[in-house]
Amino acid sequence: MQALLFLMALLLPSGAGAEEIIGGVESRPHSRPYMAHLEITTERGYKATCGGFLVTRQFVMTAAHCKGRETTVTLGVHDVSKTESTQQKIKVEKQIVHPNYNFYSNLHDIMLLKLQKKAKVTPAVDVIPLPQPSDFLKPGKMCRAAGWGQTGVTKPTSNTLREVKQRIMDKEACKNYFHYNYNFQVCVGSPRKIRSAYKGDSGGPLVCAGVAHGIVSYGRGDAKPPAVFTRISPYVPWINKVIKGKDLTSLSLHESESPS
C-alpha cells in the first residue's frame, strides 16, 4: 500500500497556497541572501510559484518541473507580500533544463535560469557555493531547507521565508518511491516528526554547512517523511558548462553513472 501513496512535485499554483515549510521556523530576514522567489506563468497560462537559489550573479538554480512559459525571479526578498527596498526583480532570459530530465520519474529534476541581467550583490543578495562533483552526503547529516511553501497540508501559506532542519536518511527509507535513484537523489526527513518542504517549495535548496547540496523535488501528499531532493554534486560538470555557455546538445548524464 505504501508504494501506492500519492507523490507530488512540490510546485503549487499561486492563489491555492504557495510557498512555505512544514514544521519549521521563520528565517531571520535576509539571512539566506541566495534565496530566489520564482513567479511563473505556465505553458497553459496559469500562475505558479517555486523557490530557487542564486549560484552566480546571472544564474539561478531550481527544479526542472518549475519550467514555465515566462518566469520572473525576485532576489533579496523576505516577505513576498511586500515591496522591500532590498528586492531585485529580474526576468528570466533562458531556461536550461537538464537534457535527461524525466517528467514522469522526476529524475534529473534540475534547471538553470539565465537572468536577463546580472544581480547586484548586496547584504540581501548573494550567491551560494555548490559542492564538488565527488561530494556525497552521508546518512545522519543535518541540513536545512528553506522556502515560501505551505505550512501544513491544509494550512494557508505564510508570506515570509521559512526554514526547516532536515536529516539525510538512508536510501532504504525511499525504497517505496519507484523511481528513486540514490546516485542522483537525496532521501531526507525527520523520521518521527513531520518536518518538510511542501507545496510551493519546489526548486529551493538543501543547504548543508553553507553549501547547496540538494534541490526540493517531490514528496508524499500527506507531507510525511521522507521527501526526495535532487542531488547536486553529480551535475556540477554540466552546471559549469551551462554557466560558461557551452553547447549542451551532446551532453548526457547516464542514470547508471556514479557521482564520484
Curated annotation (Swiss-Prot):
Which positions carry the propeptide annotation? 19-20
What gene is this protein translated from? Mcpt1
Q: What is this protein called?
A: Mast cell protease 1
Q: What is its EC number?
A: 3.4.21.39
Q: Which reaction does it catalyse?
A: Preferential cleavage: Phe-|-Xaa > Tyr-|-Xaa > Trp-|-Xaa > Leu-|-Xaa
Q: Which keywords annotate this record?
A: Disulfide bond, Hydrolase, Protease, Secreted, Serine protease, Signal, Zymogen
Show the InterPro entries listed in the entry.
Peptidase_S1_PA (IPR009003), Peptidase_S1_PA_chymotrypsin (IPR043504), Peptidase_S1A (IPR001314), Trypsin_dom (IPR001254), TRYPSIN_HIS (IPR018114), TRYPSIN_SER (IPR033116)
The signal peptide, as residue positions, is 1-18
On whether Disulfide bond is a keyword of this UniProt record, the answer is yes
What the record says about family reads: Belongs to the peptidase S1 family. Granzyme subfamily.
Q: What Pfam families is this protein classified in?
A: Trypsin
Biological role stated in the UniProt entry: Major secreted protease of mast cells with suspected roles in vasoactive peptide generation, extracellular matrix degradation, and regulation of gland secretion. May participate in generating perivascular beta-protein which ultimately aggregates into amyloid-beta deposits.
The protein's superkingdom reads: Eukaryota
